[in-house]
Regions:
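Intrinsically disordered, low-complexity segments enriched in serine/proline and basic residues
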Residues: 3-21
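Phosphate-binding site recognition
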Residues: 15-17, 23-251
Length: 251
């Protein structure tokens, strides 16, 4: 799939060798969908907010991990910008995904949150702060909210396409039925690329290991999103999290 695999070293730098993000810059916004000042639309998957990161900041113990953002800023729009953070539970993977969404997403204003943290001292802090259309998918959440696990890929696709169409309706006619096709068409029509964040990437591989249909559908979804030449045209940055090493996902 082309993702870098994280070194299991305890070095701080090595702990963030695997982020995956897809960012989209919106051109046209549906008036009925505006939820924030300034005309920016905040959704569940496209243009996520910063609430989850705010909870982490308000916690009794908070460790500044914004050095990860220095790295992702550096590798954005390069072959190194496909990152998979594979680590055991409780290693802060979801925290990292929420931090990336809060920093990059156009759907929120996170200046005060990051002020005083390490990233705010870097030269390109302002350049990337809340400048992108981020797609943030939590696969565990989708699995918990679908009645039939065999429909999860269709459910993910339905939800993301619905939000993409609120902004890119002119670029996405009714016949567009997959996320990769939608992102490719948007890039071709507008020149905009995406930051994609996928949390709990491997939950279906672990929890539905005995269901071959789910496995096949999901692997094909991931291949369509990230494998080959076409995704490099519409992906600005990708950050994926999971427990299993990426090589075990059979992609």
């Amino acid at each position: 799939m082309g993702f870098s695999q994280e070194d299991e070293s305890e070095k701080p730098e090595a702990a963030w060798e695997n982020p995956v993000l897809v960012i989209v810059r919106g051109i046209k916004y549906n008036e009925s969908y505006k939820m924030l000042t300034g005309g920016i639309c905040m959704g569940s998957y496209l243009h996520p907010g910063n609430d989850a990161f705010e909870v982490a900041l308000n916690s009794e113990i908070y460790v500044d991990k914004t050095g990860l953002l220095t790295y992702t800023n550096k590798v954005m729009n390069t072959l190194q910008g496909y990152i998979c953070n594979s680590r055991p539970r409780r290693f802060g993977k979801s925290f990292a995904a929420n931090m990336l969404a809060a920093y990059y997403s156009k759907g929120c204003d996170s200046r005060k949150m990051f002020s005083g943290l390490a990233i705010s001292q870097t030269a390109d802090f302002e350049k990337h702060l809340n400048q992108y259309d981020v797609i943030h998918l939590d696969i565990q959440w989708f699995l918990s909210n679908v009645s039939d696990p065999e429909q999860i890929v269709a459910y993910i696709t339905k939800c993301t396409l619905a939000e993409l169409r609120t902004i890119y309706a002119d670029q996405l006619p009714p016949e567009v039925s997959t996320d990769p096709d939608a992102l490719s068409r948007i890039k071709e029509a507008t020149g905009q690329k995406f930051v994609i964040i996928i949390d709990e990437l491997d939950v279906l591989i672990r929890d539905e290991a005995s269901n071959q249909k789910i496995q096949d559908d999901y692997i094909n979804f991931l291949r369509g999103m990230f494998k080959g030449t076409e995704p490099t045209k519409y992906i600005q940055l990708a950050f994926l999290t999971g427990i299993l090493p990426i090589k075990k996902l059979k992609t």
